[in-house]
Amino acid sequence: MRIVIGSYVVRFPLGGYLSWVGQWLHGFARLGHEVTLVERAGWRDACFDPRTGAMGDDCAYGVATVTAFLERLGLSRFGFEDADGRTYGLTATGAFAGADLFVDMGAHGSFAEEAEQAAVRILVDGEPGYTQMKGVAADYDAYYTVGLNVGTSRSTVPTAGVEWRPIFDPVALELYAPLPPAGDAYTTVMSWQAHGRLEHDGRVYGQKDLELPKFLDLPGRVRPPLELAIAGKHVPRAELEGAGWRLRDAHAASATFDAWRDYIAGSRGELAVCKQVFVATWSGWFSDRSA
């Protein structure tokens, strides 16, 4: 089959995003399918440059990073359109020509018109709760979510009028060579506040900034060190360090796919909290990192 995947790795060319999308791309390719990655800026200042920590219109770093990453996976079909309409690689029309399947993994409907060329269009939701509360376009043939409870009586996530099917992110173990733990700490890479809080039906939902404080004193209760590679707004660094948490720069730990992979390989194990919206809604969130 000819499969087109839409995501946001040029806009956010960080190791964790590359790992997530890359494992889908790699998995489909291993099954013998022709795989194409597409992305569109969609608005001004949409591209993050991890070298400067700034958002802007210059997508050159992201394009170069993604192109090199795809080459490592043995892939070459790629197209990106910046905020001025300039195309890098394939045009959107060319990318979708003859497509059997379009998988939207964060393109946020930006290819709605071009995706009509695909025989089947599906949405894969990686942010259960946020996706449904913000509203979902009705131009997909099927809807999948890593919120395994969404659409059941166990979860309060609104269905937005569609049927949600549970799905697990693929894990390509060959991209992560087995190594003995190099470090002594349990770690995670996280954002304290990646974006603003969300209000739905009179209730406000937050992120990891509302969940991690519940475990603030955990380092004093266990023997192994606990480390947070952390970024985001309003991080209470002094409070966290005072409670015994070791802090690292999340952007440094995830600046590239190799940095991300090496940081994980050097960890004793993953210790993380979910975003508060995932917890409060009993979404059943289960990601590639959960696996």
Regions picked out by a protein language model, each given a short descriptive name:
Residues V4-S155, A253-A259, Y263, V279-T281:
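Extended catalytic core of nucleotide-activated donor transferases of GT-like folds
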Residues G16-G27, Q207-F215, W285-R289:
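Conserved alpha-helical elements of sugar-nucleotide-dependent glycosyltransferases
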Residues S7-R11, D82-A83, I122-V124, L198-G202, ...:
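Short, basic, glycine/proline-bearing loop/turn elements
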Residues R2-V4, L123, A142, E163, ...:
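Generic structural signal for residues positioned in beta-strands
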Residues R154-G269, V277-V279, R289:
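Conserved catalytic-core segment of nucleotide-activated headgroup transferases in glycan assembly
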Residues M1-F12, D104, D184-G196:
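Short hydrophobic beta-strand segments
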Residues V103, L271-V273:
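A short hydrophobic beta-strand element within the catalytic core of glycosyltransferases
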